[in-house]
Amino acid sequence: MIKGNSFPKTSRLLVNSQFRTVMAKRLSARDELLVLYACESGLDYPRIGISIGKSCGNAVIRNRLKRLLREAFRQNKHLVTPGFDFVVSMSPQWVRQTRGRKDAKTVVGAIKLAQIRDSFLKLAAQLTSGRA
């Protein structure tokens, strides 16, 4: 395994208070796929928290989305400005489009890692430009 590509616990937001701190800062950006919240952490590496609500679908769908988000962050954390904590969730627009569809698994299966990666990196760059 490549050492720089790991995803240790220190790279994750783990407890509710960490999520609340990021959300309280109200620094956010969204696109058609993701909503990203950010705040400065003072650490020399970025951290991520993933929040996928039940409105996104059943457990299979939610777990697939979380795996894609974690993998996109893990592979690209070197491209993200260090010193920021991020909380990422699915865009309400995307949730509305997929909710109640019989083919929701197919829709989620069609989301590619590259789409998640591009969306995350674009939003992270918007939030961290001119900071840190």
Model-derived features: positions:
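Positively charged, solvent-exposed patches that mediate nucleic-acid binding
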Residues: M1-A132
